[in-house]
Amino acid sequence: ITEAGYEVDGCDDVRCFVESGFSNKDVLVFPLWRGGASRNRTAIVPAYCEARNIPFIRGDAYVQAVCQDKSLSKMMANAAGISVPGEMVLQSEDDLSSFSPSSRLRGPFVVKPLHSACSIGVDNSSLCHNDDLARDRAANLFAEGLGPVVCEEFIEGEEIALCFIEEQGTIVKRCVGTYMGIDGKSPF
């Protein structure tokens, strides 16, 4: 961006952004902030931009809130006719004592934070082949402050990303991306 002749300012938190006076400048905001413990953390900057009529790149506050909630986004995908894996949501550590994913789901299971993106809280221990491993992984996520937790059926295959560019209510560009490992194969 700077090579194209534009000035780039960065803020480490929402307060810095709000107090910076960006609303008084001719700007375009790239809301990449992912901090804080709120499940709405990716929606905060877009919501502020919308309220102040500051142009920004990425989904609006509603899109961010839906996409951050893995269970809600799967429910919406299912309502649109897209098959989704079965899941169980653990809202708190109190749910761990009765957590037995094999009673409702086909293994193996993927256990990860319910409200995160960018693979936050996902590592090799997220793929769990039995109830004990799933319970341990969920307990670790709660201990790391990454709860609520979702446990879902593992679906082998390519990871697909759908991208849309919208201008004033009209989709003007679509793209589909698939994730491949360095060997050119799907790692899943």
Describe the role of every protein-language-model region.
Residues C11, L32, K112, E152, ...:
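A cross-family glycoside hydrolase active-site/sugar-binding cleft signature
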Residues F17-V18, A117, E158-A161:
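Short, active-site-adjacent cap segments at secondary-structure transitions
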Residues F22, Q64-V150, E156:
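Active-site nucleotide/adenylate-binding loops and adjacent lid/helix of ATP-dependent enzymes
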Residues G35, E93, L114-H115, I155, ...:
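Short, flexible active-site-adjacent loop segments at beta-strand->alpha-helix junctions, enriched
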